[in-house]
Design a protein with these regions (language model features):
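Membrane-interface interhelical connector segments
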Residues: 30-47, 94-103, 107
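Interfacial helix-loop-helix junctions of multi-pass membrane proteins
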Residues: 98-116, 158-165
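Alpha-helical transmembrane segments of helical membrane proteins, especially in multi-pass transport
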Residues: 110-132
Length: 165
């Protein structure tokens, strides 16, 4: 199934971008500056609800899922959606990667599980978009799989982020 293959490729690309961002921070020796910019304290994470975390993440993924549906009706929308979706994924994973480079193992312990689930959720939504972009018939089953996977992964990620893994 090409949707599963695409989701795997998007996940791999996201992981690669995050690693590159982390390496850039470490190689340039700007960990302190990046930590000052983020202002995070891994020893005392912020207190937000799982609903808040889920709502923030689902908005981003919804753009890809709705984009997949929209492309069936208006194929030229890809000229607008392609750069938006690419930028959303790239910016999010680069920010996470830079933070991991700056904070190292303490932050990695806090975010590893839920960040990977969030990336996989974005990849599932992105896979639906890529499927529609190639003008392959986006079956209702494939779209439903992507939507259910996205929502399920984001729910699990939100619970892990708030209550710890």
């Amino acid at each position: 199934m090409s949707v599963v293959r695409d989701a795997g490729r998007i996940t791999a690309a996201g992981l690669l971008l995050a690693v590159v961002a982390a390496l850039v921070v470490v190689v340039l020796g700007v960990e302190h500056d990046v930590r000052a910019w983020y202002g995070l304290h891994p020893s005392s994470p912020s207190r937000v609800s799982a609903t808040h975390v889920f709502a923030n993440n689902i908005r981003t993924c919804a753009i890809a899922l709705l984009g997949a549906v929209n492309l069936r009706l208006w194929p030229r929308a890809r000229w607008l959606l392609d750069p938006i979706l690419a930028a959303l994924l790239a910016i999010n994973v680069l920010l996470v990667g830079a933070a991991l480079g700056a904070y190292g193992t303490p932050l990695l312990r806090l975010v590893a599980a839920h960040a990977l689930l969030e990336l996989m959720a974005a990849a599932a939504a992105g896979a639906a978009y890529l499927h529609a972009r190639r003008r392959e018939p986006l079956s209702l089953a494939a779209l439903a799989w992507c939507a259910v996977a996205t929502v399920g992964l984001l729910l699990l990620a939100a619970v892990l982020e708030v209550h710890g893994a």
